[in-house]
Structure formats: structure tokens, C-alpha cells
Amino acid sequence: MRYTIGLSAHKESTMQSHELNTRIISRGKEFFAAIAGEKPSLFDKGAWMGKVMDWCMQNDQFKIRMFRFVDVFPSLTTSRLLTEHVREYFGKEQEMPAFMATGAKMAGMLGSLGGAVLNRLLTSNIEEMARQFIIGENTREAVKNLERQRRDGFAAVVDVLGEATLSEEEAESYTTTYLELLEALKQEQASWHGLPGSGGDPDLDWGHAPKVNVAVKPTALFCLANPQDFEGSVTAILDRLRRIFLKVRELNGFLCIDMESYRHKEITLEVFRRLKLEHPDYPSLGIALQAYLRDTDRDLDSLLVWAEQHGVQISIRLVKGAYWDFETVRARQNGWEIPVWTIKAESDAAFERQARKILEHHRICHFACASHNIRTVSAVLELAKALQVPEERYEFQVLYGMAEPVRKGILRVAGRIRLYSPYGSMVPGMGYLVRRLLENTANESFLRRSFAGDAGIEQLLEDPVVTAERERAARAARPKKERTGPGGLSPFRNEAMVDFTRLGHRDAFPAHIARVRSLLGRTYPLYVGGREVATNDLLPSVNPNRPSEVVGQVCLADTKEVADAIAAARDAFPAWRDTDPRTRAEYLLKAAGAARGRIFELAAWQILEIGKQWDQAYADVAEAIDFLEYYAREMIRLGEPRRIGHSPGELNHYFYEPRGVAAVIAPWNFPLAISMGMVSAAIVTGNSVVFKPSGLTPVIGWQLVELFREAGLPAGVFNYIPGRSSVMGDFLVDHPDISLIAFTGSVETGLRIIERAAKVHPGQANVKRVVAEMGGKNAIIIDDDADLDEAVPHVLMSAFGFQGQKCSACSRIIVLDAVYGRFIERLVAMARATRVGPAEDPGCYLGAVADEQAQQKINDYIALGKREGGVLFESQLPEGEGYFVPMTIIGGIRPEHRIAREEIFGPVLAIMRVNDFDQALQWANSTRFALTGGVFSRSPEHLAKARREFRVGNLYLNRNITGALVERQPFGGAGMSGGGTKAGGPDYLLHFMDPRVTTENTMRRGFAPVEADDDWVE
């Protein structure tokens, strides 16, 4: 009986849904009929912009070049730069529209005069393009255009352009701009008549709505907004947002908190909730939600329940979302679930579903429908009618400069429409402009399909649920790209990065830090031949941020214990060498699984023992897992003998075998990742290992013992022997049974190892091989057209992440003269906003350095830098204990200065000023190191030149230069940075093995078996 009732109710619901959809389609057809023959100005081919849009829709490659050119355009401040970039971006005349071809030709014929003509032409047209979407560059322009809009019957939401500011000065400027705009609107709104509506207060728009309505982007209010520091970000954003809100309230206006990238979604929701509870009786405070996010159904339900519980009125502006490409790419790069719907119709269906939910709760939630989609607008109108929603509880919004026929149509049928009107200068407006251009030229854009495509009205008005189901079915029917890894394993994928948008990840760090802290102070033995070995010589390991806190103490090996470990490894080697490569790989995969299950705990050990920040510590563990997973697959691939040569009558096989006992000497800065990388490479290739961890991170080194023990690795294959380098270092390197040495550390130590390994000792049967990764003096070039919004935070991250204690860290910035002043101003301002303090505090950007010796060395280099150049910035240090040094930026440095040549391994950045890009490359290549480097440029020719001439092992273009990922960015350099090996790359394991060849004569009495790939004479 219950089933029958349920079925009946479902049938009735389906019928109602069908009837509603019929009404939506009918209204949509009426809408299209009312605007027949009209076209948005964007698609008017008689105008410059319309021609450009038409070219973009016809040619994807031109679209990419055009939008990138628009992005770089504000930085092209001279005729020379402009002419060069037109040539670089568009090249041949037949590849560009006529106006550009004419201008380029004129520039070529007339030299600087032609360049000036081209400059004026492009400037005029691109500024016209920007004005299409931006209501004004200053308050006067904005107010004038707002008044014009109101005369046409349109209200407005004003948004100051800018997001993700880089400094507190920029955040304060953004806040001040809002306050000044609001003050100007306060003077003007008194003269504005309320837009006509169905009764109510004539001094309000439509009788019920504030005339002043602004939208604010939270990330513009705090330059270091970051979900890792969730509470600090929320608090800092609110500090400035309150000032804007109080000014809005003074005007009896409306404030909407914009939703930006998914990364900041939870911060934005929390900011809204807190501000609303501070002013529970003020109704004109809202938040934007993005229908294309998979979380939005849940977030909407949560907000509505929260509003009910607290008895407050809220307002929601529902948008589709404008960062689809960014969110998709970022999620894939980091190994996260994609947060957005991947089928356009799914976003449309979600919008209608969420619109219904809001309209059903109109008693507590005002609704702003922000869409140009006629199907969506028709659905909202019909839903509101069916649910008997009062007119004052919902309105419509469209973007300024877009979809003029749609906004006029909405004005006719609903009367309540706002234009979302960005305001500000062209430079921050370029990002917004490019997003709008992408939106309008996308194949799935409703406006393009409606006004510049051939989609029929029935297709445009189809129920998006039906469209999405059809697309999902079509995707399911397509042939799947089956990818398998070596030996039938799944393909290698990097371990997902920590996702601080997830509450579980944010909460995991304090919990695991507390748990690990409860385990501090233990004593750790040696691990030799599968047995724990205690010694009386103990070394305490301390927290560099709190040296009085002992993380643990380890037993130290003397030469006797080292000899015992080498003997255990030597005895284990024959059986391990003969173990099938697949079986050896399985041990690595088991260790990877064990590490994955303890990933937050292992990160917590790094936070406390070596002072890594939360994200840095997690990334170190993830990289260790990557090495295990990747090298396991690589050994399976390399473990199969490969036939070489195809001459009939013989079989030649090429294969590899291990070298013997490997000494692995690890650094402290990546105590799990690099240690695991070198150890796992040696083990999986069939060598047995004697592992010496750094004396600064021996407790983390012990974690390798636990992981391999959990994996069931045979006794003697892995041996753990912490000890003083002065006591055991040379003994380990010189020992005749050592066949291979894997080392990561300083140049001085690396060269000493290479020198000693070259000497043959009595009883030695192998020429020792050294796999050494040493130091770097890495440079980033800032070109004269660089995007400083990108360059500044990436430079800061590259130079000061983990206190600059990475061999890949940036220690030199080479800046072209044309942008020097602007770059330095913004870099110093962002550095000034950071905080120095304990690494376990997520609000601290810079923590303590490794130990007192490192502290003294870095301070000595800072003093040297002050003598060789001039200090541009030096941070304040926290009070109390800890090996802290200031974040320091030193200007006026040249290639001959020691500060530009010697590796410091700390948060000290040298700034070098050059005239042109060629000089920048020359200076970048002027050291004896060749590890990493970077270039920030939007010149295709300069990027190509850097690829050819910037001679480093890892070159990064338009991104930070640290954080190389296994497989994607195999890591290692040449010169004095190393021997050219690439950790995490396809040839790294070869350095741990010797190649062998077997040749068999298959001819017997004149008969030879035929192999499938033999080269026979036809």
C-alpha cells in the first residue's frame, strides 16, 4: 500500500514537472519572439568588437592569442613593446584581422611612427572593449553611467574590480575605493527617484529595494587569504568588510559578498554568517552562490537551515559561475575531485533546482537570479508564479555590457532587473574582461548559441535535466581510453595534495600535532639486519621553533655499527638481487600504502622536528609516496629484458642488474621525501641499503624503518644507522663493500664524497658510483611584460617557502629596468604582510631555520648583503626561543657579489636590475650552479629564448620554481648542482644498476628459428 501511494505521488510530481516544463518552454518562446531580430552588441560584426568576437569564434588558436594579448596589453607601455607583441602573438598577416594586419604593416613600413599609429589604434579599440563591460574607471564615470542606466529602467550592483590583492596596502586601497564610491553614491542617491514598481515606498527601487547595491570580493580585503589559516583569514577579511558594510548600512544600501574561487568558498560562507549574526535585523545583506559547484546544493540547504535556526533574513544571488576552466585544471593538477559540474547542462539543471529551493523559502530568503539564459529566466518566472512568490522576494540580474536584448526582455516581463556593473581601472579589469570574452565565445555559451550560432529555439529551451542525461549517455557510449601501467598496475598518479578547503584536512593537523607531541622524547635505536641495536651515544633532536622541546633522541653509530650494517646489507644482497623485480616493487607499493595511511602523522613529525609549515610537510610525505609508487612501476618496466638488434640467427638481450650495497646519505630539508626517493630507488633496483639520515631529522628517518618493516621488507635489505658525519661519514664512503653512494646535500660535502669515492681501497671490487644532488643559486627573471599579480606571490613562495631551505629555492631575482620599481614595491609590500613565527601556527608564513649553526650562517650572509647592496626589506622577529632569522630582501646586487654567487640556504633574496632580457639571461647563467630557474614573461619569443638559453636542470615559466613533482617534473641539475641525474624521472633508476647484454647464437646445423621481429631479406 505504501508503495502504491509513493508511486502515485511520484506520478503526480512527474505530471506537475511536465506541466511546469511546458509552461517554461511556452514562456521562453514568447521571450524569444519579443526580442526577435535583436542582437547583443558583442556580436555586431559592424563594430570592431563584433569582428574580433567573430574571429575568435571561427578560430580557436586566434582566440587564445587574442585573449592573451588583451591580458598583456596594459603592460605594453611603449610603441616598441606593442609592435613586438603584435608581431609575436599574431605573426603572419593572414593570421590576423584586417585592422591588425594594416596596423602591423604600417608599423613595419614607418618604423616608430607606424608603431605609434598601431599603438593608438589598438589602445582605442581595446579600451572600447573594456568599456563594454566596465561601467567606469573613476567615480565620476561610474556615477554618470549608473544614472544613465537608471533612466533606462535598470538598477545596478556595483563591483570594484580587483581580487586576490597582494599586500595590506592594496587591500586597504580596495577598501578605501569602496568607501569613496559609497560616499559619492550617498550624495547622488538623494536625487534618484525610485524605479517604478507595484507600490511600496516610492523612495526605494520597485517600492522595496535599496537604490545602492554593491558587491565585494573577500580576497581583495586580505592579501593572505588562505584556507590553511582559516580563522586568521576570516578575521582579517571581516575587519575591513565591517567598515564597508557600516557605510552601506548608513546609506540604507545592500551589500552582497561575492563568491570567488572554490578555494575560498568556505571562508566566504563563514564571513557571511558571522557578519549576518552581528547585524541580524538588517535584511539587505546577501551572498552569491555558484550553481556550477557540486557543493552548492548542500551549502544552500545549510544556509537555509542556519537562517531558520537564527531567525534571520538572508539574500542569495545565484550565478552559474565564472571560473570553470580554472577550477577544473587546478583540481586535476592537485589530484582532487573536480568541484564543478563537468557538463554545462548539469550546471543549468542545478541552477533551476536551487532556484526552486530558494523560492520555496522566500519567507526567509530573498532571491537574485543572475543569468542571461532565457530558459533559466523563464523557469524562475514560472516557478515563482507556481509558488506564489511575492514580487519583492525575487529579482533578476545580468552583467553590464552583455545580452542587451535579454535584459530588455526581462525589464518588460519582470520589471526588476539589475546590471552587475564592475568599476575600476583597466589593469585589474583585464582579468574580468578576459573571463567575459571567454564566456561569450565558448561553444556552450547560451548567448553565443542564441545570437551567434545556429541552435534552434526548441534546443535552447530544452529541460537541462534531459540535456544532461543525453550528454552523460553520449559520454558513456564513447570508447574509453584504457590506460594501464607496467605489469598491469594502474597508471602512476601523483598523490593528491592536501586540500584545506576540507574541514577534515584543516582539523587533522592540530589533532595529529597534539598526538605526535604526546610521543616526543622517546629513544630510537639503530636498525641493522632486521634487529634494533642500542648504543650509549645518544643525540637529541629538537624542535627548531622551540629548541627546549626534545622531539626524540637517537642512538648513534660508531664505525663498528657501520661495519655491522654494511655486512648485514652485503649478506642480504645476493638473495635480494635475485628477487623478481615485480616482487621488489610490491614491497614499495606496500610501504606507500602504509605511508598513505599515516600521512597526517608523518607530516606532523616534520612540523615538529624540522619546522615545516602544514602544506610543506604534507607535500613532503606525498612526494615520498610518489617515489615509492613511481619507482615500483619503473622497475617493473625496466625489469623485462629487451631484445636489441634484429639480425636473424642470434638473440641479443639488454637488461639491468643491481650494483651491490648502496650507502644513502640524506639531507634534513626533505627528510622523508628525498630519503625515501634515494632509498626506494636503491632497494627496488635490487641493491641493499645502509641509510644515514641527517642528524637534524633522525626521528623522521626512523619512520622509514617503520614503513619498510610494515611492508615486510626482508632483513638486511634496509639498515638505519644515524651517526656523526665526523665519526662515520668517511668510513661509510670509503668502505670497500660500498658499490654505490646516493647523496643529497651541500656542494662541499658532495664533492668530498665524489673525490673519496674515486679512490680504490683494499678489497674493493667495484668502481664506486656516486649519485649526487647538490646545491643551487637559482634565479627568476621578471620580464618587462610580466604579470606582476602572478609573479609577486610566486617569487615570495619560491624564495621564502620553508624559510628558503630548499636547493630549488629562488635566491636571485633579475628584474628588467622597465618594471623594477613596480615589482619591488609590490614584492616588499607583500613580504611586509607576512608573519614570522612557529611553523605549527598556520598564520605564520616564515618559521625557524634548521638549527643554531644555520641561523648564524644566514645572519652572516645578511650582514654581507648589507655591505654589498642595500636592504629593501627585513622582517621583524618573534619574541622567545627558536632559530629565527629575518626574511630579507637585498637590492643593488651584481653577479660578482658573493650574495649572488654563494648558496645561503635561507630566506635571503638578492635583487638584480638589468637593461634587457639578454642581459637577464646572461646574469642568470653566471653562477657555477645549474639547478632551477624561472621566467615570468608574456612574450612568446622571450619564453622560447629562455627554453633554449636558460641552462638549468628545471626551468619553470610563469610559475613558482619549487615543488617539483615526481614524473611531471623530474628533478636535478648540472654544473655544481649535480651530475645530471633526474630524481623522479624515467632514467633515474638506471644510475642504481649496471646494464648487461647476453648474445645467443640460435643457428643449429644451418637452421635458425624465426623470431617475429627478425630482419629477413624479402
Residues of each region from the PLM?
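ALDH superfamily catalytic-core signature
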Residues: 707-712, 734-735, 740, 749-894, ...
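Short, positively charged and aromatic/hydrophobic N-terminal segments
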Residues: 2-11
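Residue-level signal for inorganic ion chemistry
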Residues: 530, 548-549, 569, 584, ...
